[in-house]
Amino acid sequence: PDQSLYFANARFVEDHIFDRVQAGGPVRDVVLMCAAINEIDLSAVETLETINTRLDEMGVRLHLSEVKGPVMDRLRRAHFLSQLTGEVHLAQYDAFVALLPDAARA
């Protein structure tokens, strides 16, 4: 079921991303699949900004995929998209294909 990304669960998402990045081998890109996010509040946008900045400091790009229109509008109004170190992909598969050459060179 679709959910909101908001103050109560945004920190969980942040912790989960960094647990996964730090637990694995070298990571160059993180893709956050947003298909189930139907609403996002300002604190969640701020959390995404923090995730984007921290990943950038680690040399990792943050990408988004399958972002719904209203969520994309909120991210655009908050100027998050201009700060995003990666790309916004229409579909998760598109992100995979776009990033595959980078992964193959690693």
Language-model regions, residue ranges each:
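Structured cytosolic domains appended to multi-pass membrane proteins
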Residues: 1-106
